[in-house]
């Protein structure tokens, strides 16, 4: 038996749907300024005011900057390692970042002192003043380097090879007439290129009277005929033996 929904409840649902559609259709069109105002953002003035309020009490905030310049010369390059860190006493943090020199080690998850791990901060910067841009632009090939399997040592050449188009002739079993000497000379004088050249018949060549050369010589033809006769004689004797 199907449950019957009371009529007032159906009317209430229809009325509710109608009200929702009316609100959606008749709602105010939002402008771009109103759209931007819905986002929470801090202006530049708010940031300046915030930092100024924290900077008034000099006894609470202690800014210490340690710069460590270390230049190493390797292939004409100098690297400068600079570590800048900031710690605030208001946070009651006793963990200071450690600046390490060359040769020092810090503990890892496998070995070493774990108390110093995670506190080291080293930023590597490239000193552009000491870099020779002309030297970087020229590729340097190491003669002592070994080639990987499958690689071939090639010399870098800037010359561009000239384009030589090739003409592929199709293989056919037809007998082609032997051209005259003058025609071969004209073909050698033709300039090959990518442009399509118009086709012209050779006026000096007689296309009606063409001397065809046989595929086999007279001796080869005689041998073929002799073999065919022997084959016929052999097949005839076999037929006679079957009848007997």
UniProtKB/Swiss-Prot annotation:
Keyword annotations: Phosphoprotein
Modification type Phosphoserine: residues: 58, 235
A biological process term (GO) from this entry: acrosome reaction
Domain of life of the native organism: Eukaryota
Phenotype caused by lack of the gene: Mutant mice show no obvious anatomical abnormalities associated with ciliary dysfunction.
InterPro entries per UniProt: IFTAP
Functional description taken from the UniProt entry: Seems to play a role in ciliary BBSome localization, maybe through interaction with IFT-A complex.
Protein's recorded name: Intraflagellar transport-associated protein
Phylogenetic lineage: Eukaryota, Metazoa, Chordata, Craniata, Vertebrata
